Amino acid sequence: RAQRRWGISAQLYSLRRAGDDGAGDYTALAGLAAQAARRGADAVAISPTHAGYPALPEHDSPYSPSSRRWHNVAYLDCDAVPGADVVRRTNGAAADVAPAPDTPLIDWPQVLPRKLRRLRACFDAWRANGEPSRDAFEQFRAAGGAALDAHARFDALQAFCIEHGIGADWRQWPAQWRMPATAEVDAFAHAHADAISFHTFLQWCASRALGDAQQAARDAGMAIGLIADLAVGSDRAGSDAWAHGTTLLRGVSVGAPPDLFNADGQAWGVTTWTPAALRANGFTPFIDLLRAAFAHAGGIRIDHVLGFARMWIVPEGGSARDGAYLRYPLDDLVRLVALEAARHRAVAIGEDLGTVPAGFRERLGAQGIAGMRVLWFERDADGAFRPPSAWDRDTIAMTSTHDLPTVAGWWRGVDLAWRRVAAGAAAKTATPHPAGDDVGRAAAAHGSAPDERNDPVLRSDAPATDDGHDTPPPASADLRAPQAERATDRAALWRALQHAGCAPAGDPIPSADTPPVGAVLAYVARSPSPLAIVPLEDLLALNEQPNLPGPPCGHPNWLRRLPRAIDALFDADVHTRIAAIEHARRTAEDDA
Protein backbone atom coordinates (compact mmCIF):
# COMPACT_ATOMS: atom_id res chain seq x y z
CA ARG A 1 0.00 0.00 0.00
CA ALA A 2 1.50 3.31 -1.09
CA GLN A 3 2.21 5.84 1.63
CA ARG A 4 0.27 9.08 1.27
CA ARG A 5 2.74 11.88 2.00
CA TRP A 6 2.20 15.59 2.53
CA GLY A 7 4.32 18.68 2.22
CA ILE A 8 4.16 22.45 2.24
CA SER A 9 4.81 25.10 -0.37
CA ALA A 10 6.61 28.31 0.49
CA GLN A 11 7.42 31.60 -1.16
CA LEU A 12 11.11 31.73 -0.24
CA TYR A 13 11.28 35.53 -0.17
CA SER A 14 8.41 35.63 2.35
CA LEU A 15 10.21 33.70 5.09
CA ARG A 16 11.31 35.43 8.26
CA ARG A 17 14.05 34.57 10.72
CA ALA A 18 15.81 36.46 13.47
CA GLY A 19 18.63 38.59 12.08
CA ASP A 20 17.68 38.41 8.42
CA ASP A 21 18.27 41.32 6.05
CA GLY A 22 14.64 42.15 5.38
CA ALA A 23 13.77 39.25 3.05
CA GLY A 24 13.65 35.48 3.11
CA ASP A 25 16.91 33.65 2.51
CA TYR A 26 18.38 30.19 2.06
CA THR A 27 19.17 29.90 5.77
CA ALA A 28 15.51 30.51 6.61
CA LEU A 29 14.58 27.89 4.01
CA ALA A 30 16.83 25.31 5.67
CA GLY A 31 15.28 26.14 9.02
CA LEU A 32 11.75 25.88 7.64
CA ALA A 33 12.50 22.50 6.06
CA ALA A 34 13.83 21.13 9.33
CA GLN A 35 10.86 22.50 11.29
CA ALA A 36 8.34 21.10 8.81
CA ALA A 37 10.07 17.71 8.74
CA ARG A 38 9.77 17.43 12.50
CA ARG A 39 6.01 17.92 12.08
CA GLY A 40 5.76 15.12 9.53
CA ALA A 41 6.13 16.93 6.20
CA ASP A 42 8.07 15.16 3.46
CA ALA A 43 8.54 18.05 1.02
CA VAL A 44 8.90 21.81 0.74
CA ALA A 45 7.91 23.12 -2.69
CA ILE A 46 9.56 26.51 -3.11
CA SER A 47 9.16 29.51 -5.38
CA PRO A 48 11.79 29.78 -8.15
CA THR A 49 15.38 30.44 -7.11
CA HIS A 50 16.42 31.46 -10.63
CA ALA A 51 18.89 34.30 -11.00
CA GLY A 52 17.46 37.79 -10.84
CA TYR A 53 19.18 41.11 -11.47
CA PRO A 54 21.57 42.10 -8.66
CA ALA A 55 21.83 45.61 -10.13
CA LEU A 56 18.07 45.98 -10.65
CA PRO A 57 16.40 45.25 -7.30
CA GLU A 58 12.99 46.54 -8.37
CA HIS A 59 12.64 43.62 -10.80
CA ASP A 60 11.38 41.14 -8.24
CA SER A 61 9.23 38.58 -10.06
CA PRO A 62 10.65 35.07 -9.51
CA TYR A 63 8.91 33.97 -12.71
CA SER A 64 10.65 36.56 -14.90
CA PRO A 65 14.29 35.69 -14.16
CA SER A 66 17.46 36.87 -15.81
CA SER A 67 18.61 33.25 -16.04
CA ARG A 68 16.89 29.97 -15.24
CA ARG A 69 20.16 28.04 -15.01
CA TRP A 70 21.79 30.13 -12.26
CA HIS A 71 20.60 31.11 -8.79
CA ASN A 72 19.13 34.15 -7.09
CA VAL A 73 21.85 35.76 -4.98
CA ALA A 74 19.29 38.05 -3.31
CA TYR A 75 18.40 35.06 -1.10
CA LEU A 76 21.89 34.72 0.36
CA ASP A 77 22.39 35.01 4.11
CA CYS A 78 25.25 37.49 4.48
CA ASP A 79 26.28 35.91 7.79
CA ALA A 80 26.61 32.43 6.29
CA VAL A 81 28.90 32.98 3.28
CA PRO A 82 32.67 32.40 3.28
CA GLY A 83 34.44 35.45 4.66
CA ALA A 84 31.56 36.50 6.91
CA ASP A 85 33.37 35.40 10.06
CA VAL A 86 36.41 37.49 9.08
CA VAL A 87 34.19 40.54 8.54
CA ARG A 88 32.58 40.05 11.95
CA ARG A 89 35.94 39.80 13.67
CA THR A 90 37.25 42.84 11.83
CA ASN A 91 34.26 45.18 11.82
CA GLY A 92 32.10 43.98 14.68
CA ALA A 93 28.38 44.56 14.25
CA ALA A 94 27.23 45.34 10.74
CA ALA A 95 26.81 49.02 9.98
CA ASP A 96 23.70 48.41 7.88
CA VAL A 97 20.57 47.89 9.94
CA ALA A 98 17.89 45.53 8.67
CA PRO A 99 14.24 46.65 8.49
CA ALA A 100 12.05 46.21 11.53
CA PRO A 101 10.98 42.59 12.03
CA ASP A 102 7.31 43.41 11.47
CA THR A 103 7.79 44.98 8.02
CA PRO A 104 4.87 43.49 6.04
CA LEU A 105 6.40 43.98 2.58
CA ILE A 106 9.92 43.57 1.23
CA ASP A 107 11.60 46.79 0.17
CA TRP A 108 13.99 45.32 -2.40
CA PRO A 109 15.51 48.67 -3.49
CA GLN A 110 16.67 49.04 0.12
CA VAL A 111 17.33 45.40 0.97
CA LEU A 112 19.31 44.20 -2.04
CA PRO A 113 21.90 47.01 -2.38
CA ARG A 114 22.64 46.78 1.33
CA LYS A 115 22.96 43.02 1.06
CA LEU A 116 25.34 43.32 -1.90
CA ARG A 117 27.54 45.71 0.07
CA ARG A 118 27.77 43.19 2.88
CA LEU A 119 28.43 40.34 0.48
CA ARG A 120 31.16 42.33 -1.23
CA ALA A 121 32.86 42.86 2.12
CA CYS A 122 32.70 39.11 2.74
CA PHE A 123 34.15 38.38 -0.70
CA ASP A 124 37.03 40.78 -0.19
CA ALA A 125 37.80 39.33 3.24
CA TRP A 126 37.55 35.75 1.99
CA ARG A 127 39.89 36.43 -0.91
CA ALA A 128 42.40 38.40 1.16
CA ASN A 129 42.65 35.72 3.82
CA GLY A 130 43.37 32.86 1.43
CA GLU A 131 40.75 30.58 2.96
CA PRO A 132 40.96 26.83 2.22
CA SER A 133 37.56 26.95 0.48
CA ARG A 134 39.31 28.67 -2.43
CA ASP A 135 39.86 25.27 -4.09
CA ALA A 136 36.14 24.49 -3.90
CA PHE A 137 35.37 27.85 -5.49
CA GLU A 138 37.79 27.25 -8.35
CA GLN A 139 36.28 23.80 -8.93
CA PHE A 140 32.81 25.35 -9.08
CA ARG A 141 34.04 27.98 -11.51
CA ALA A 142 35.69 25.39 -13.75
CA ALA A 143 32.59 23.19 -13.73
CA GLY A 144 30.40 26.15 -14.69
CA GLY A 145 32.64 26.89 -17.64
CA ALA A 146 31.70 29.38 -20.31
CA ALA A 147 28.03 29.45 -19.23
CA LEU A 148 28.85 30.59 -15.70
CA ASP A 149 31.41 33.07 -16.98
CA ALA A 150 28.86 34.56 -19.39
CA HIS A 151 26.32 35.01 -16.59
CA ALA A 152 28.90 36.69 -14.34
CA ARG A 153 29.96 38.91 -17.23
CA PHE A 154 26.35 39.91 -17.78
CA ASP A 155 25.79 40.85 -14.14
CA ALA A 156 28.99 42.90 -14.06
CA LEU A 157 28.29 44.56 -17.40
CA GLN A 158 24.70 45.39 -16.50
CA ALA A 159 25.79 47.00 -13.23
CA PHE A 160 28.36 49.05 -15.16
CA CYS A 161 25.80 50.15 -17.76
CA ILE A 162 23.28 51.19 -15.13
CA GLU A 163 25.92 53.12 -13.21
CA HIS A 164 27.03 54.96 -16.35
CA GLY A 165 23.55 55.80 -17.62
CA ILE A 166 23.56 53.33 -20.53
CA GLY A 167 20.63 51.36 -19.15
CA ALA A 168 19.77 47.90 -17.85
CA ASP A 169 18.44 46.37 -21.08
CA TRP A 170 21.23 44.74 -23.09
CA ARG A 171 19.25 45.32 -26.28
CA GLN A 172 19.93 49.04 -25.80
CA TRP A 173 23.64 48.63 -25.09
CA PRO A 174 26.31 49.47 -27.66
CA ALA A 175 26.28 46.85 -30.41
CA GLN A 176 29.65 45.39 -29.41
CA TRP A 177 28.28 44.53 -25.94
CA ARG A 178 25.10 42.78 -27.07
CA MET A 179 26.60 39.29 -27.00
CA PRO A 180 29.12 37.64 -24.68
CA ALA A 181 31.77 36.49 -27.18
CA THR A 182 33.10 39.73 -28.65
CA ALA A 183 36.52 41.30 -28.35
CA GLU A 184 34.95 44.29 -26.61
CA VAL A 185 33.24 42.13 -23.98
CA ASP A 186 36.51 40.24 -23.50
CA ALA A 187 38.24 43.56 -22.93
CA PHE A 188 35.57 44.58 -20.42
CA ALA A 189 35.97 41.25 -18.62
CA HIS A 190 39.73 41.73 -18.42
CA ALA A 191 39.36 45.27 -17.07
CA HIS A 192 36.66 44.24 -14.57
CA ALA A 193 37.92 40.78 -13.61
CA ASP A 194 37.38 41.60 -9.95
CA ALA A 195 33.66 42.30 -10.43
CA ILE A 196 33.22 39.15 -12.49
CA SER A 197 34.94 37.07 -9.81
CA PHE A 198 32.58 38.60 -7.25
CA HIS A 199 29.48 37.62 -9.21
CA THR A 200 30.91 34.13 -9.70
CA PHE A 201 31.53 33.95 -5.96
CA LEU A 202 27.88 34.85 -5.33
CA GLN A 203 26.72 32.01 -7.57
CA TRP A 204 29.01 29.61 -5.72
CA CYS A 205 27.59 30.76 -2.39
CA ALA A 206 24.01 30.37 -3.64
CA SER A 207 24.70 26.86 -4.92
CA ARG A 208 26.21 25.88 -1.57
CA ALA A 209 23.32 27.41 0.37
CA LEU A 210 20.68 25.59 -1.66
CA GLY A 211 22.58 22.34 -1.24
CA ASP A 212 22.71 22.95 2.51
CA ALA A 213 18.95 23.56 2.61
CA GLN A 214 18.24 20.29 0.80
CA GLN A 215 20.63 18.46 3.10
CA ALA A 216 18.90 19.96 6.12
CA ALA A 217 15.55 18.73 4.81
CA ARG A 218 16.81 15.20 4.25
CA ASP A 219 18.73 15.08 7.53
CA ALA A 220 15.54 16.05 9.35
CA GLY A 221 13.74 13.08 7.81
CA MET A 222 12.04 14.37 4.67
CA ALA A 223 11.60 11.73 2.00
CA ILE A 224 11.71 14.31 -0.81
CA GLY A 225 12.98 17.59 0.59
CA LEU A 226 12.98 20.65 -1.63
CA ILE A 227 10.86 20.75 -4.77
CA ALA A 228 12.39 23.37 -7.06
CA ASP A 229 10.21 25.46 -9.35
CA LEU A 230 11.20 25.70 -13.02
CA ALA A 231 9.82 28.88 -14.58
CA VAL A 232 8.39 28.74 -18.10
CA GLY A 233 10.96 31.17 -19.50
CA SER A 234 13.42 33.94 -18.76
CA ASP A 235 13.21 37.69 -19.16
CA ARG A 236 13.95 38.89 -22.67
CA ALA A 237 16.35 41.49 -21.32
CA GLY A 238 18.23 39.06 -19.10
CA SER A 239 21.36 36.97 -19.00
CA ASP A 240 19.90 33.94 -20.80
CA ALA A 241 18.63 36.03 -23.70
CA TRP A 242 21.96 37.90 -23.92
CA ALA A 243 24.07 34.74 -23.85
CA HIS A 244 22.02 32.42 -26.04
CA GLY A 245 21.28 34.76 -28.93
CA THR A 246 19.25 33.28 -31.75
CA THR A 247 18.52 30.03 -29.92
CA LEU A 248 15.75 31.89 -28.06
CA LEU A 249 12.52 33.32 -29.41
CA ARG A 250 12.91 36.97 -30.44
CA GLY A 251 10.27 39.64 -31.01
CA VAL A 252 7.59 37.75 -29.09
CA SER A 253 6.51 36.95 -25.56
CA VAL A 254 5.44 33.61 -24.19
CA GLY A 255 1.93 33.63 -22.73
CA ALA A 256 -1.44 31.93 -22.65
CA PRO A 257 -4.58 32.28 -24.79
CA PRO A 258 -7.85 33.73 -23.50
CA ASP A 259 -9.75 31.27 -21.34
CA LEU A 260 -12.45 31.20 -18.67
CA PHE A 261 -10.10 32.60 -16.04
CA ASN A 262 -8.29 35.23 -18.14
CA ALA A 263 -10.62 36.59 -20.80
CA ASP A 264 -7.88 38.71 -22.41
CA GLY A 265 -5.25 35.98 -22.34
CA GLN A 266 -1.79 36.54 -20.92
CA ALA A 267 1.60 37.73 -22.18
CA TRP A 268 4.26 36.98 -19.61
CA GLY A 269 7.14 39.04 -20.96
CA VAL A 270 9.49 36.05 -21.07
CA THR A 271 11.17 34.02 -23.78
CA THR A 272 12.35 30.44 -24.22
CA TRP A 273 14.17 28.31 -26.78
CA THR A 274 12.93 27.87 -30.30
CA PRO A 275 11.94 24.28 -31.14
CA ALA A 276 14.49 24.27 -33.98
CA ALA A 277 17.31 25.36 -31.66
CA LEU A 278 16.48 22.63 -29.16
CA ARG A 279 16.68 19.97 -31.84
CA ALA A 280 19.77 21.44 -33.51
CA ASN A 281 21.62 21.42 -30.17
CA GLY A 282 20.57 17.92 -29.22
CA PHE A 283 18.39 19.35 -26.43
CA THR A 284 21.57 20.20 -24.51
CA PRO A 285 20.27 23.58 -23.21
CA PHE A 286 17.17 21.86 -21.82
CA ILE A 287 19.19 19.05 -20.26
CA ASP A 288 21.56 21.55 -18.63
CA LEU A 289 18.57 23.41 -17.21
CA LEU A 290 17.03 20.24 -15.80
CA ARG A 291 20.29 19.18 -14.19
CA ALA A 292 20.68 22.60 -12.60
CA ALA A 293 17.13 22.38 -11.23
CA PHE A 294 17.57 18.86 -9.85
CA ALA A 295 21.05 19.53 -8.43
CA HIS A 296 19.86 20.70 -5.01
CA ALA A 297 16.33 19.31 -4.82
CA GLY A 298 14.37 16.13 -4.41
CA GLY A 299 11.98 17.16 -7.15
CA ILE A 300 10.98 19.86 -9.58
CA ARG A 301 7.71 21.54 -10.44
CA ILE A 302 7.56 22.59 -14.09
CA ASP A 303 5.58 25.80 -14.49
CA HIS A 304 3.17 25.75 -17.44
CA VAL A 305 4.20 22.27 -18.55
CA LEU A 306 1.58 22.68 -21.30
CA GLY A 307 4.33 24.57 -23.13
CA PHE A 308 6.07 21.25 -23.74
CA ALA A 309 3.41 20.60 -26.39
CA ARG A 310 2.65 24.08 -27.64
CA MET A 311 3.51 27.59 -26.55
CA TRP A 312 1.23 30.59 -26.97
CA ILE A 313 3.41 33.20 -28.67
CA VAL A 314 2.40 36.88 -28.53
CA PRO A 315 3.88 39.49 -30.90
CA GLU A 316 5.98 42.14 -29.16
CA GLY A 317 3.77 45.14 -28.42
CA GLY A 318 0.57 43.23 -29.18
CA SER A 319 -2.13 41.81 -26.97
CA ALA A 320 -2.37 38.17 -25.93
CA ARG A 321 -5.42 37.90 -28.18
CA ASP A 322 -3.07 38.36 -31.15
CA GLY A 323 -1.08 35.25 -30.28
CA ALA A 324 -0.75 31.86 -31.94
CA TYR A 325 0.48 28.42 -30.93
CA LEU A 326 4.02 27.27 -31.66
CA ARG A 327 4.41 23.50 -31.40
CA TYR A 328 7.18 21.89 -29.35
CA PRO A 329 8.53 18.30 -29.32
CA LEU A 330 6.45 17.07 -26.39
CA ASP A 331 7.56 13.45 -26.34
CA ASP A 332 11.25 14.34 -26.44
CA LEU A 333 10.90 16.87 -23.62
CA VAL A 334 8.90 14.65 -21.26
CA ARG A 335 11.26 11.72 -21.82
CA LEU A 336 14.22 13.91 -20.92
CA VAL A 337 12.46 15.05 -17.74
CA ALA A 338 11.73 11.43 -16.84
CA LEU A 339 15.35 10.45 -17.50
CA GLU A 340 16.83 13.24 -15.38
CA ALA A 341 14.31 12.62 -12.59
CA ALA A 342 15.35 8.97 -12.53
CA ARG A 343 19.05 9.86 -12.58
CA HIS A 344 18.56 12.19 -9.61
CA ARG A 345 16.07 9.87 -7.85
CA ALA A 346 13.66 12.77 -7.74
CA VAL A 347 10.01 13.50 -8.45
CA ALA A 348 8.76 15.54 -11.39
CA ILE A 349 5.56 17.59 -11.25
CA GLY A 350 3.97 19.41 -14.17
CA GLU A 351 1.68 22.42 -13.63
CA ASP A 352 -1.00 21.36 -16.12
CA LEU A 353 -3.72 23.91 -15.39
CA GLY A 354 -5.35 25.81 -18.22
CA THR A 355 -6.27 24.87 -21.78
CA VAL A 356 -5.08 21.24 -21.91
CA PRO A 357 -4.71 19.49 -25.30
CA ALA A 358 -6.44 16.13 -25.67
CA GLY A 359 -4.28 13.26 -24.44
CA PHE A 360 -1.67 15.57 -22.93
CA ARG A 361 -2.06 14.47 -19.33
CA GLU A 362 -1.92 10.83 -20.31
CA ARG A 363 1.39 11.36 -22.10
CA LEU A 364 2.84 13.08 -19.05
CA GLY A 365 1.61 10.34 -16.76
CA ALA A 366 3.10 7.65 -18.97
CA GLN A 367 6.53 9.13 -18.23
CA GLY A 368 5.91 9.45 -14.50
CA ILE A 369 5.35 13.23 -14.48
CA ALA A 370 2.60 14.03 -12.00
CA GLY A 371 0.03 16.66 -12.84
CA MET A 372 -1.56 19.05 -10.33
CA ARG A 373 -5.11 19.02 -9.05
CA VAL A 374 -6.22 22.19 -7.28
CA LEU A 375 -9.33 22.37 -5.11
CA TRP A 376 -10.86 25.36 -6.88
CA PHE A 377 -10.89 23.52 -10.21
CA GLU A 378 -12.09 20.14 -8.91
CA ARG A 379 -15.75 20.77 -9.55
CA ASP A 380 -18.45 19.07 -11.57
CA ALA A 381 -20.51 20.74 -14.28
CA ASP A 382 -23.27 21.52 -11.76
CA GLY A 383 -20.81 23.38 -9.52
CA ALA A 384 -20.50 20.65 -6.89
CA PHE A 385 -17.03 20.04 -5.49
CA ARG A 386 -15.77 16.62 -6.48
CA PRO A 387 -15.25 14.30 -3.50
CA PRO A 388 -11.59 13.64 -2.70
CA SER A 389 -11.96 9.99 -3.63
CA ALA A 390 -12.81 11.07 -7.20
CA TRP A 391 -9.67 13.15 -7.68
CA ASP A 392 -7.17 11.78 -10.17
CA ARG A 393 -4.62 9.37 -8.77
CA ASP A 394 -0.91 9.87 -9.41
CA THR A 395 -1.28 13.65 -9.34
CA ILE A 396 -0.38 16.22 -6.71
CA ALA A 397 -3.31 17.47 -4.62
CA MET A 398 -3.28 21.13 -3.58
CA THR A 399 -5.62 23.58 -1.94
CA SER A 400 -4.34 26.49 -4.04
CA THR A 401 -1.36 27.99 -5.87
CA HIS A 402 0.51 31.30 -5.71
CA ASP A 403 -1.78 32.74 -8.42
CA LEU A 404 -5.06 31.71 -6.76
CA PRO A 405 -6.94 32.65 -3.59
CA THR A 406 -5.98 31.19 -0.25
CA VAL A 407 -8.62 29.11 1.50
CA ALA A 408 -9.33 31.86 4.03
CA GLY A 409 -9.25 34.56 1.35
CA TRP A 410 -11.65 32.61 -0.87
CA TRP A 411 -14.07 31.94 1.98
CA ARG A 412 -14.06 35.60 3.00
CA GLY A 413 -14.25 36.86 -0.59
CA VAL A 414 -11.04 38.86 -0.37
CA ASP A 415 -10.14 37.78 -3.90
CA LEU A 416 -13.41 39.19 -5.25
CA ALA A 417 -12.48 42.70 -4.16
CA TRP A 418 -9.03 42.35 -5.72
CA ARG A 419 -10.53 40.99 -8.94
CA ARG A 420 -12.72 44.07 -9.16
CA VAL A 421 -9.65 46.28 -8.77
CA ALA A 422 -7.74 44.25 -11.38
CA ALA A 423 -10.66 44.43 -13.82
CA GLY A 424 -10.76 48.20 -13.42
CA ALA A 425 -7.04 48.42 -14.14
CA ALA A 426 -7.42 46.22 -17.21
CA ALA A 427 -10.26 48.36 -18.52
CA LYS A 428 -8.03 51.43 -18.32
CA THR A 429 -5.25 49.71 -20.25
CA ALA A 430 -5.42 50.50 -23.97
CA THR A 431 -3.82 47.18 -24.96
CA PRO A 432 -4.57 44.46 -22.42
CA HIS A 433 -1.51 42.61 -21.17
CA PRO A 434 0.96 44.04 -23.69
CA ALA A 435 4.12 42.13 -24.49
CA GLY A 436 6.42 45.10 -24.13
CA ASP A 437 10.15 45.67 -24.21
CA ASP A 438 11.05 47.23 -20.88
CA VAL A 439 13.38 45.41 -18.55
CA GLY A 440 11.56 44.88 -15.31
CA ARG A 441 8.11 44.73 -16.92
CA ALA A 442 6.74 41.74 -15.12
CA ALA A 443 4.87 38.92 -16.70
CA ALA A 444 1.19 39.74 -16.68
CA ALA A 445 0.42 36.59 -14.75
CA HIS A 446 3.67 36.26 -12.86
CA GLY A 447 5.01 39.62 -11.79
CA SER A 448 4.68 43.13 -10.56
CA ALA A 449 5.41 46.42 -12.24
CA PRO A 450 7.39 49.37 -10.88
CA ASP A 451 4.30 51.40 -10.03
CA GLU A 452 3.23 48.71 -7.57
CA ARG A 453 6.50 48.60 -5.72
CA ASN A 454 6.07 48.10 -1.99
CA ASP A 455 2.64 49.73 -1.90
CA PRO A 456 -0.50 47.60 -1.72
CA VAL A 457 -2.80 50.60 -1.69
CA LEU A 458 -1.62 52.74 -4.58
CA ARG A 459 -5.19 52.68 -5.83
CA SER A 460 -7.89 54.09 -3.58
CA ASP A 461 -10.19 51.21 -4.47
CA ALA A 462 -7.72 48.48 -3.49
CA PRO A 463 -9.01 46.24 -0.68
CA ALA A 464 -7.29 46.00 2.67
CA THR A 465 -4.29 43.67 2.73
CA ASP A 466 -4.06 43.13 6.47
CA ASP A 467 -4.19 39.40 7.13
CA GLY A 468 -5.46 40.17 10.59
CA HIS A 469 -8.84 41.41 9.42
CA ASP A 470 -11.72 39.09 10.15
CA THR A 471 -14.55 40.53 8.11
CA PRO A 472 -15.19 40.22 4.38
CA PRO A 473 -14.92 43.27 2.12
CA PRO A 474 -18.02 45.49 2.15
CA ALA A 475 -20.52 44.83 -0.59
CA SER A 476 -20.62 47.39 -3.37
CA ALA A 477 -22.89 47.49 -6.38
CA ASP A 478 -20.40 45.68 -8.60
CA LEU A 479 -19.50 43.13 -5.89
CA ARG A 480 -22.98 42.02 -4.83
CA ALA A 481 -23.41 39.56 -7.69
CA PRO A 482 -20.03 37.81 -7.28
CA GLN A 483 -20.45 37.81 -3.49
CA ALA A 484 -23.83 36.15 -3.86
CA GLU A 485 -22.26 33.58 -6.17
CA ARG A 486 -19.50 33.03 -3.63
CA ALA A 487 -22.07 32.41 -0.91
CA THR A 488 -23.50 29.66 -3.11
CA ASP A 489 -20.01 28.26 -3.63
CA ARG A 490 -19.30 28.32 0.10
CA ALA A 491 -22.44 26.30 0.70
CA ALA A 492 -21.37 23.81 -1.97
CA LEU A 493 -17.93 23.42 -0.41
CA TRP A 494 -19.40 23.03 3.07
CA ARG A 495 -21.69 20.25 1.84
CA ALA A 496 -18.69 18.55 0.24
CA LEU A 497 -16.71 18.82 3.49
CA GLN A 498 -19.57 17.23 5.40
CA HIS A 499 -20.10 14.43 2.89
CA ALA A 500 -16.39 13.59 3.03
CA GLY A 501 -16.41 13.45 6.82
CA CYS A 502 -14.15 16.50 7.13
CA ALA A 503 -16.81 18.62 8.86
CA PRO A 504 -19.57 17.58 11.30
CA ALA A 505 -22.67 16.52 9.40
CA GLY A 506 -25.12 18.44 11.57
CA ASP A 507 -23.25 21.72 11.85
CA PRO A 508 -24.49 24.84 10.05
CA ILE A 509 -22.23 26.49 7.51
CA PRO A 510 -19.70 28.84 9.15
CA SER A 511 -20.11 32.53 8.50
CA ALA A 512 -18.12 34.32 5.82
CA ASP A 513 -15.66 35.57 8.43
CA THR A 514 -15.04 32.10 9.93
CA PRO A 515 -13.28 30.05 7.24
CA PRO A 516 -13.08 26.31 8.03
CA VAL A 517 -9.45 26.11 6.93
CA GLY A 518 -8.58 22.92 8.79
CA ALA A 519 -11.53 21.05 7.30
CA VAL A 520 -10.58 22.17 3.79
CA LEU A 521 -6.98 21.05 4.27
CA ALA A 522 -8.21 17.66 5.46
CA TYR A 523 -10.54 17.44 2.45
CA VAL A 524 -7.69 17.87 -0.02
CA ALA A 525 -5.49 15.52 2.02
CA ARG A 526 -8.18 12.82 1.69
CA SER A 527 -7.49 12.56 -2.06
CA PRO A 528 -5.74 9.43 -3.37
CA SER A 529 -2.77 11.55 -4.45
CA PRO A 530 0.62 10.22 -3.32
CA LEU A 531 1.53 13.77 -2.26
CA ALA A 532 -0.67 16.58 -0.96
CA ILE A 533 0.94 20.04 -0.84
CA VAL A 534 -0.38 22.77 1.42
CA PRO A 535 0.73 26.38 0.88
CA LEU A 536 2.09 28.02 4.00
CA GLU A 537 -0.53 30.73 3.47
CA ASP A 538 -3.21 28.08 4.04
CA LEU A 539 -1.43 26.35 6.91
CA LEU A 540 -1.36 29.77 8.61
CA ALA A 541 -4.93 30.63 7.48
CA LEU A 542 -3.82 33.86 5.79
CA ASN A 543 -6.16 35.88 3.60
CA GLU A 544 -3.87 37.17 0.88
CA GLN A 545 -2.40 35.29 -2.07
CA PRO A 546 1.22 35.89 -3.16
CA ASN A 547 0.41 37.05 -6.70
CA LEU A 548 -2.60 38.50 -8.49
CA PRO A 549 -2.48 37.76 -12.24
CA GLY A 550 -3.26 40.68 -14.50
CA PRO A 551 -2.04 44.21 -15.18
CA PRO A 552 -0.61 46.41 -12.40
CA CYS A 553 -3.39 47.32 -9.99
CA GLY A 554 -1.66 48.00 -6.68
CA HIS A 555 -1.50 44.40 -5.51
CA PRO A 556 1.93 43.78 -3.89
CA ASN A 557 2.94 40.79 -5.98
CA TRP A 558 5.89 38.78 -4.64
CA LEU A 559 6.49 41.20 -1.76
CA ARG A 560 4.50 39.95 1.23
CA ARG A 561 6.36 38.49 4.16
CA LEU A 562 4.88 35.90 6.49
CA PRO A 563 3.56 37.33 9.75
CA ARG A 564 5.85 35.24 11.97
CA ALA A 565 9.43 33.97 11.96
CA ILE A 566 10.04 30.35 11.02
CA ASP A 567 10.69 29.42 14.66
CA ALA A 568 7.21 30.64 15.60
CA LEU A 569 5.20 29.40 12.61
CA PHE A 570 4.03 26.12 14.08
CA ASP A 571 1.74 27.32 16.85
CA ALA A 572 -1.21 25.46 18.37
CA ASP A 573 -3.59 26.33 15.51
CA VAL A 574 -1.09 25.13 12.92
CA HIS A 575 -0.50 21.91 14.88
CA THR A 576 -4.25 21.31 14.87
CA ARG A 577 -4.38 21.75 11.08
CA ILE A 578 -1.39 19.45 10.61
CA ALA A 579 -3.08 16.80 12.74
CA ALA A 580 -6.14 17.03 10.47
CA ILE A 581 -3.92 16.67 7.39
CA GLU A 582 -2.10 13.64 8.77
CA HIS A 583 -5.33 11.95 9.84
CA ALA A 584 -6.76 12.53 6.36
CA ARG A 585 -3.64 11.14 4.72
CA ARG A 586 -3.90 7.95 6.80
CA THR A 587 -7.58 7.70 5.89
CA ALA A 588 -6.65 8.01 2.21
CA GLU A 589 -4.20 5.13 2.67
CA ASP A 590 -6.90 2.98 4.27
CA ASP A 591 -9.27 3.77 1.40
CA ALA A 592 -6.67 2.88 -1.26
PLM segments and residue spans:
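Conserved alpha/beta catalytic core and glycan-binding cleft of carbohydrate-active enzymes
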Residues: 136, 352-437, 466, 470-539, ...
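Active-site-proximal loop/turn and secondary-structure-junction residues that shape catalytic pockets
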Residues: 14, 50, 230-236, 306-311, ...
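Active-site cores of enzymes that catalyze phosphoryl transfer or operate on phosphate-rich substrates
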Residues: 131, 137-186, 258-271, 275-301, ...
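Acidic/aromatic-lined carbohydrate-recognition and catalytic surfaces
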Residues: 1-244
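Intrinsic, low-complexity polybasic segments
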Residues: 440-446, 450, 455-461, 471
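Active-site-proximal helices and loops of the catalytic beta/alpha 8
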Residues: 62-63, 214-215, 233, 237-263, ...
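Hydrophobic faces of well-ordered beta-strands that scaffold small-molecule active sites
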Residues: 6-10, 44-46, 226-228, 300, ...
